[in-house]
């Protein structure tokens, strides 16, 4: 039994070392990419959302941080403080916002209430990233399920020089389940997460679009 235990412990150690090495390599690539982008900060035009965004950014970022550090701070913030469920806070905004500001209403509700579904996570991340200056927008389509098959989903991408990089805090939050975050869906090309996403041929919701 002791031999079996030691073998399991050894294998677990190897697994953790592999994850750590993978994250370090990934961080280096993502850092170089995001820090190379010329920033164009953009608000939503919906005051409650823009106020929530600036209050959030003032708490979790500062001027000494690089673009990569700010984006990772936003991603971590959503994973660490939000949970999957019904975004009740959005209702006070969606009752009166025009169709082109529904995404901003969802984002405001998520940043205030910290509970929401995939579109709420994505809208919140999009407004934070756009305020920093990155060309971030939501994508509607399907994603793979852990138990097999596909399901409807909304995620975000950041477009850098015509290449879309997936950022999906809701899925990474679900994978982490309160444990360490391994960033499986952070700054990944569709090829790097092959089979995980199928963008729809049309935009069903139209929350946010490319600059």
Label each residue range with its predicted role.
Residues 2-12:
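Bacterial N-terminal signal peptides that target proteins for export
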Residues 13-22:
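Bacterial N-terminal signal peptides
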Residues 43-110:
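Secondary-structure boundary elements
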Residues 180-211:
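Low-complexity, Gly/Ser/Thr/Pro-rich intrinsically disordered linker/tail segments
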Residues 70-74, 114-129:
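Active-site nucleophilic cysteine motif
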Residues 21-34:
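Sec-dependent signal peptide cleavage junction
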Residues 36-44:
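Cofactor-/ligand-binding subdomain signature composed of acidic, glycine-rich
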Residues 120-189:
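Hydrophobic/aromatic-rich core segments of domains that either
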């Amino acid at each position: 039994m002791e031999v079996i235990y030691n073998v399991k412990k050894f294998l677990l150690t190897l697994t953790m070392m592999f994850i750590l090495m993978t994250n370090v390599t990934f961080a280096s690539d993502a850092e170089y990419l995001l820090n190379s982008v010329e920033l164009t900060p953009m608000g939503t035009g919906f005051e409650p959302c823009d106020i929530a965004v600036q209050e959030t950014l003032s708490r979790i970022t500062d001027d000494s941080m690089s673009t990569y550090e700010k984006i990772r701070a936003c991603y971590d913030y959503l994973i660490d403080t939000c949970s999957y469920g019904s975004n009740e806070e959005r209702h006070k905004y969606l009752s009166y916002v025009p169709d082109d500001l529904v995404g901003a209403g969802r984002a405001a509700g998520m940043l205030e209430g910290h509970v929401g579904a995939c579109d709420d996570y994505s809208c919140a991340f999009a407004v934070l990233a756009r305020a920093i200056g990155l060309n971030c927008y939501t994508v509607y389509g399907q994603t793979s399920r852990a138990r097999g098959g596909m399901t409807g989903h909304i995620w975000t991408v950041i477009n850098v020089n015509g290449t879309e990089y997936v950022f999906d805090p809701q899925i990474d939050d679900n994978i982490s389940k309160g444990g360490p975050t391994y960033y499986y869906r952070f700054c990944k090309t569709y090829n790097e997460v092959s089979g995980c996403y199928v963008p729809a041929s049309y935009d069903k919701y139209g929350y946010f679009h490319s600059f």
